Amino acid sequence: ISNNPILGGGSADGAGLTISSQFTENVGASLFWLRAENDNAGSNSVKQYSDAMDFVGLTVPMTFDGVKVTPWGMGGIIGHDSFKGGNFDLNYPMAQGMLPLMGTSTIVANSDKDHGSAWFGGVSADLSYFDPFRFALDAAYGSVDLGTSKLNGKNFDVKRSGWYAALLAEYKLESCTPGLLFWYSSGDDANAYNGSERLPSIDPDVYV
C-alpha cells in the first residue's frame, strides 16, 4: 500500500545479500540477509561479540490473474551493543523503532542478554481483478526481545511487540483515482515496565 513501516521506504542501507528464484510462472521466492549494524563497539584491535545486528528473511510473491499476494517472514539476532555501540539516545531512529519507551542506552547495556532476538511476519495483497476497482492489504506482526533490565529498582522488560494492518480501496477514473485508506495498529498499555505493545521497526519510515 505504501512504504514499509519495518524496513522503511528505501532509505535504509546496509550490507546484505539477496537470492531470488522463480519456481513457476506464478510463484517465486527471495531469500535475503541484512547486516543492519556492525562493529559499533570496541576498536580495530578489540573484537566485540555483541555489536552487530543481523536479519534473515524470506518473501514468496505469488501472482495470478488480477491478484498478487506476498507472504513474508524475517528473523534477527541483535547484539546489545549494536545500537551505536551502546552510546545512543532516543533520537536515534533505530532505537525509536525497536525499543520500548524509556529504553535508554543504560537500560540496554544492563540487560541480562548479550544478544536479543527479533522476528517479523506479514502479508501484502493487491486485488485488481474487479478493475476499475482496486483493493490492497498490508499486515504485519513483529517482536523484539532484548531481555530484562532494571529501572527505578524494578524489573524492566526490554521488549517490544505489536502489529498493524492497512486496507486500501480505490476506483480508477479517467482523470483521477479516488480511494479510501484504513489502518490500525496495536498500542502501548498503561504499564511502562512490561515492554512496548507497538510494532517494532528496524528503519521506520512510517511510525505505527
Q: Model regions: which residues?
A:
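Signature for the C-terminal beta-barrel architecture of outer-membrane proteins
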Residues: N3-G195
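Flexible glycine-rich, low-complexity coil/linker segments exposed to the extracellular/periplasmic environment
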Residues: Y193-V208
